[in-house]
A protein has these predicted regions:
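Transmembrane helix-bundle signature of multi-pass membrane transporters/permeases
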Residues: 229-233, 262-266
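Membrane-helix and juxtamembrane interface regions of eukaryotic multi-pass membrane proteins
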Residues: 1-220, 246-265, 271-366
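Intrinsically disordered, low-complexity regions enriched in proline, serine, glycine
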Residues: 224-227, 239-240, 275-276, 320
């Protein structure tokens, strides 16, 4: 019986052997979907529901009440970080892998087939396309939580009563999704057949993103982490939009508007450092000095690294642009010189034979 290739990879003419690497890669979305469905089905049975709910539901609620006759509306639940969260992170990591394959199969692959991109630009297109979807989703989800919790209208909520900062349902779900997404980047290196020379930067991105968010989530910095992540994703959205523009804009007609990316990056980095100093140095430090200073130093080191990487990349791009411009000028000069010589020869060929300048061979014979 023929096996239909799964989502997320291009289908091949031959069906690979079952349980081979190629089979797993081609059908990884279907395999992961089956694993996820096991937890969903187990949730429907009373005997397995407690086990399955540990992976699907959010736990460690500290306040809240279910609706009752005395209180028909109940009370909203609030949550804290706990060990059971890693079960939920595992399940939502499976969900992220499935969504990654769906976006790749039904959006990015269909668009890339019409563009006829080179391998390098195709890699950039797929990477930026996937990240933009995640960043846009995270930005709007984070902004929604910020507005609901009133962190903009009352900025002091970021440090008041620290570390007693219980989270709402959406606030906790935001962090579970963040941790799951950065964790799913590691198996995607295998599923997407990423070359070894391209894996290092992606592994660093995955591990650093997961570690930073996990530390903020575990040590009760969920409020400031929510604000800073939402702000960071705004800059990442603009950055990857311009990266996609670079893929589509083959003639570099829109190169002049790339300063918007630079302005956004500077704004995000400056706003991040200001919010970090106000919250950690002037707010949290009044409650727990050591934890606040450690978080502030870590935040500043991270911002310094991002600024250094940005400046290095801009200098490299500037050098490449100058080198390409110089090569273009040299090519234009050669073409202009060749055109002048051709025009001169054509002009001489139109003259009578007696008026034409003798060729070097004829002059030597004389």
């Amino acid at each position: 019986m023929a096996i239909k290739p799964g989502m997320g990879r291009k289908s091949s003419s031959k069906n690979p052997p079952i349980f081979s690497h190629e089979f797993v890669i081609q059908n990884h979305a279907d395999i992961i979907s089956c694993v996820a469905m096991v937890f969903v089905v187990a949730l429907m049975d009373e005997s397995t529901s407690p086990f399955a709910s540990a992976f699907i539901s959010l736990h460690h609620n500290v306040t809240g009440e279910e609706p009752s006759r005395e209180n028909p509306h109940g009370k909203p639940f609030s949550y804290v970080a706990g060990i059971k969260d890693y079960c939920a992170i595992f399940f939502y990591t499976l969900t992220c892998i499935i969504m990654h394959a769906i976006i790749q199969e039904y959006v990015l692959d269909k668009v890339s087939k019409r563009l006829h991109l080179s391998k390098f630009k195709l890699s950039l297109f797929n990477e930026s396309g996937q990240l933009i979807v995640f960043y846009v989703f995270s930005f709007f989800m984070g902004a929604n939580v910020i507005l609901r919790e009133g962190y903009l209208s009352k900025f002091s909520l970021l440090w008041e009563q620290f570390p007693n900062h219980p989270m709402s349902f959406l606030h906790k779900l935001f962090f579970i999704i963040q941790l799951a997404y950065y964790l799913h980047m590691l198996p995607e290196l295998y599923f997407q057949k990423v070359k070894k020379e391209d894996q290092q930067s992606k592994i660093i991105h995955s591990i650093c993103g997961f570690s930073v968010i996990c530390l903020a989530y575990t040590f009760s910095f969920q409020r400031i982490a929510l604000v800073l992540l939402t702000l960071h994703y705004l800059g990442e959205i603009v950055s990857h939009v311009f990266q996609l523009i670079g893929v589509f804009d083959r003639d570099e007609k829109l190169a002049s508007v790339r300063f918007v990316n630079n302005v956004t990056f500077v704004f995000v980095r400056f706003a991040t450092m200001v919010i970090g100093v106000l919250t950690l140095y002037y707010g949290v430090a009044t409650e727990t000095v050591l934890r606040a200073y450690a978080a502030l130093v870590g935040l500043m080191v991270l911002q310094g690294y991002l600024i250094y990487s940005f400046i290095t990349e801009e200098l490299r791009a500037t050098r490449e642009a100058k080198r390409e411009a110089k090569q273009h000028q040299q090519q234009q000069a050669k073409k202009s010189k060749a055109a002048k010589e051709k025009a001169k020869k054509k002009k001489e060929s139109d003259l009578p034979e007696a008026d034409q300048s003798p060729s070097p061979a004829k002059a030597k014979a004389k």
